[in-house]
């Protein structure tokens, strides 16, 4: 009995530490067999979809390939620093959105996929409460998008959890057993339950610099989301320039290879004091989402929320023809 108590305490401490120490952790293995499949998947996309037991197949379009695109050697390692904060939307993504709508995706909903930097305590939820944000004159044009996605901003995503890394997001062990089907991954569960047309993907941790696995699993997530005819928006993070544990190069490369929207938050944080980070070099500095207040706009969180809103607005306007 004592052994069980100690084991539970250890597991709890590990989960709590996962988002406090960005260098901690390792990738969990994705099961190669489930209750409905006993054969190991033969491709990255197969690995991503093997655990889904309830999602009906959606129509596909010709340019959605299950093969990972070959990296393009012309993209510089620091290319993200010169890319726009607000994404440019490709024709491919417009096609994904249109096919998704034809398949029944909800144009009024978006979902979030990510770790502790995506919890409703700090991220986007204030846009569902007019008393908790202020756009000011400069950003007043964003209000129609806030209204359009009402309810999605403060919704608790089934694919967001402190300590959830890119591997865990595709692992059924991390799914909510009360709301998700047996063998369903957190991402598959969130897409089934919320039926979004757009998702933000913001995975902040990189586990002692294991960027090879980070790249592998993030590509898997992007491929799965595209296979469900949902538009993914990939996010860069605030980073200290010269950091050897940078994920922004990987994120940018994947967005480039798949022609998916890049929400380049990392660039908006570069001019901020301490690059928008607290003393630990990972968590963002805090202030309210009052975008007409110069003091608020010296901190990391207002910029993360503002640029996320700008990215969602830009993608929604492009895919819906509201240029």
Identify the residue ranges that each predicted region occupies.
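Bacterial N-terminal signal peptides that target proteins for export
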Residues: 1-7
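Ser/Thr-rich, Proline-interspersed low-complexity disordered segments
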Residues: 19-88
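Conserved SGNH/GDSL esterase-like catalytic core that processes O-acyl groups on lipids
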Residues: 104-213
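Loop/turn elements at helix/coil->beta-strand transitions in domains of secreted/extracellular proteins
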Residues: 106-109, 194-199, 226-233, 258-261
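Extracytoplasmic/secreted cell-surface and envelope-processing proteins
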Residues: 120-122, 208-216, 235, 241-247, ...
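Active-site segments of SGNH/GDSL-like serine hydrolases
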Residues: 200, 204-206, 219, 223-251
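Catalytic His-Asp segment of secreted/periplasmic serine-dependent ester chemistry enzymes
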Residues: 241-323
């Amino acid at each position: 009995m004592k052994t069980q108590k100690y084991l539970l305490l250890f597991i709890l401490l590990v989960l709590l530490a996962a988002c406090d120490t960005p260098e901690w952790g390792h990738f969990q293995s994705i099961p190669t067999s489930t209750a409905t499949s006993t054969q190991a998947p033969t491709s990255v996309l197969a690995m991503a979809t093997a655990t889904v037991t309830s999602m009906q197949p959606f129509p596909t379009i010709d340019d959605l390939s299950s093969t990972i695109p070959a990296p393009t050697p012309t993209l510089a390692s620091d290319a993200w620093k010169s890319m726009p904060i607000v994404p440019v939307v490709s024709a491919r993504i417009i096609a994904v959105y249109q096919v998704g709508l034809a398949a029944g995706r909800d144009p009024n909903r978006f979902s979030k996929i990510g770790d502790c930097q995506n919890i409703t305590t700090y991220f986007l939820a204030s846009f569902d409460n007019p008393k908790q944000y202020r756009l000011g004159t400069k950003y007043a044009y964003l209000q129609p998008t806030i209204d359009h996605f009402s309810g999605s901003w403060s919704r608790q995503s089934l694919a967001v959890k402190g300590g959830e890394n890119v591997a865990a997001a595709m692992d059924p062990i991390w799914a909510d057993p009360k709301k998700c089907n047996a063998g369903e991954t957190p991402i598959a569960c969130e897409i089934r339950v919320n039926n979004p047309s757009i998702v933000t993907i913001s995975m902040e941790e990189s586990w002692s610099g294991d960027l090879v696995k980070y790249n592998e699993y993030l590509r898997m997530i992007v491929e799965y989301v595209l296979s469900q005819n949902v538009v993914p928006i990939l996010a860069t993070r605030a980073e200290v320039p010269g950091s050897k544990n940078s994920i922004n190069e990987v994120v940018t490369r994947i967005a480039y290879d798949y022609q998916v929207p890049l929400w380049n938050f990392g660039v908006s944080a570069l001019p901020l004091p301490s690059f928008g980070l607290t003393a630990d070099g990972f968590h963002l500095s805090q202030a309210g989402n009052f975008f007409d207040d110069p003091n608020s706009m010296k901190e990391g969180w207002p910029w993360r929320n503002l640029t996320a809103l700008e990215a969602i607005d830009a993608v929604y306007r492009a895919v819906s023809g509201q240029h």
